[in-house]
Amino acid sequence: MAIPKRLLGKTGAQVTALGLGGVCWNLLEEDRAAVEVVHRAIDRGITYLDTASSYKESERRLGLALKERDRSQLFIATKCLKRAGDELKQEIEDSFARLDLEVIDLIQVHAIDQERTLSQVLAPDGALRVIEEYRRAGKIRFVGLTGHTHPEMFAKMIQEYDFDTILNPLGPVNRVWNDFAAPTLALARARNMGVIAMKVMAAGKAPPEDRSLYLRFALGPPADVAIVGMDSVEQVEENVRVAENFVPLSQLEEKQLLERALALVPKVKKDLWWLPEQRLAS
């Protein structure tokens, strides 16, 4: 069995439906332990590798791992937080250095959740214009957008620029509390943007008995890729097995899972910073 591969929207890239998130192995104490997680993911067939400049040691450790593997079949995605000008250029240059790459497949303008940040990245010296310079130079292949907290603002941003991909919280917890799917996905699909799901396991708060169901939920339509943070080779193996044997949830399974997710949120919401205080999903 192999992890299914899917077309990542207009990028034309075929990537595995399961991606390796870049936060969790960043938190491990030893570099080698983090590298082993990345290596196991690659060896088990995962091709989409996620990181970000703001994830502390994540980019550097991914760079270490990539030195020991053939990266020609891998898709490397990072994120930038600076909004404009020389600060952003330095952030991007630092990402190249830490990853030790000549070309980055996807760089995502990270955490666009407010009107002010929208204006900043669209400005003449804003993030998108800077990234376009790198694209013209052949250093960055694709540009994406991420957002965590304001679906309506994110939907507006999708219509303001021709992004290649979007990255949103699309797990069960978000579906029942602050749904990104309804306002954003049709817009993204109409523009042939690749759709990437994050917060799949609700920052590790998914009950152990429901973890495989949470992943199956995120692997189903509409996402092309579901990225999951993993900090051990055992977690890699567990998630790969689910992806290799992926079967969409039945209507009953999904209904019952969402009911349990809704009951879970009040117990864990204080640890899930991206969720609003009050429920917004219907």
Task: Name each region found by the language model.
Residues 21-32, 77-87, 118-120, 205-209:
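Active-site mouth loops of central-metabolism enzymes
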